[in-house]
Each structure stands twice: as structure tokens, then as C-alpha cells.
Amino acid sequence: MSRIGKAIIDVPKEVTVTKDGSDIVVRGVKGELRHGIPYGLTVAISDGKLEVECKSSDKAKQAIHGYFRAELANAVAGVTKGWTKTLELSGVGYRAAVNGVNLVLTIGFSHPVTVAPPAGIAFTVNEGKIVVAGIDKQAVGQVAASIREIKKPEPYKGKGIKYEGEYIRKKAGKAKAVGGAPGGVK
């Protein structure tokens, strides 16, 4: 049995958790999240507590047990305080701006790149940093990853879009790598 799956989730007073058929609905001050209960798992809702149970000895069901419990815990945290992911722009002339709800990136392409947020996701930009915010942790992380994918940090100068605090391993240039003079002078 999963150690994470066995842990009981404490539900704050301002959050309501209800069963709706084969779904769990989590409502809070920031919004509402709905998760389908995987086959083979049961969810017990009692006063301020949530418990996910797995009666099966099947390895696949036990693997989903811990995952689903973590997903519910993230939903409870998301509807109370929300989730954010911060990205940093590094490069000469790299800029980001919010136009309405869309994020507009000027990152060295011949055209500005526009990113439209999915439902429940908001962008804010300040001083070369892009903040992706929302109540669904998985959606926030996925949108941040897709923005980073547009222009990953390159290994020579580190120009591109990276997560806040991410370390980019830099490579030596050609002249340093072979021990020769810069520019290939003979």
C-alpha cells in the first residue's frame, strides 16, 4: 500500500469537498476543481478529513492510489491559496508583456509569439519575470513548461526562458574547448 496514498488530507473550513457520481468536486474561495475517481479507489469524506482507499492488491491500482491522493491534496491547496510558477527571461532584447489576457513574447524570432492562456490560468509580467498562476497545479506547470519550450535556454550563453532558480550548465566555446586562440588565428 502507498505511504502517500494512506495519508489523510486535512480539509480547511473554507473548502467543501463533495462526491458527484464518479467525480470529486473541491470548492474553495479561489474556485472549483473536479477530479474523476479512478476505478478501484474509494474516497471517504468525513468532518474535515479526506481519505483515499485502495482495496486492490494490483500494482497498477496501488500506483494510482498515491498519485490520486496527491492530486486531491493539490486541489485542496489550489482552491485555498492557488499555485504559481515563475519563469525568467535572459537575453538581450528579450521581453514579455501581457496584452489583454494573452502573453506576448519578443524573444529573438522574426515575429512576436502570443500565448493564449487556458481557462483558469492568468499571466503577470514584471521586470523580466513571467508568473503563471491558477488553482490547478498540473495546468500551471504544463503552461509554464510550454512557455519554456518556445525558447529553451541555450548552453553557451544561457539565453532563453528558464524557471526561476533553474541552473543552466554552460558549455565552453570552441576556442576554449580545443585550447587554441580565439577566432581561429594561426
Q: Which sequence ranges carry the predicted segments?
A:
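N-terminal intrinsically disordered, cationic/polar leader segments
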Residues: 2-65, 69-145, 149-186
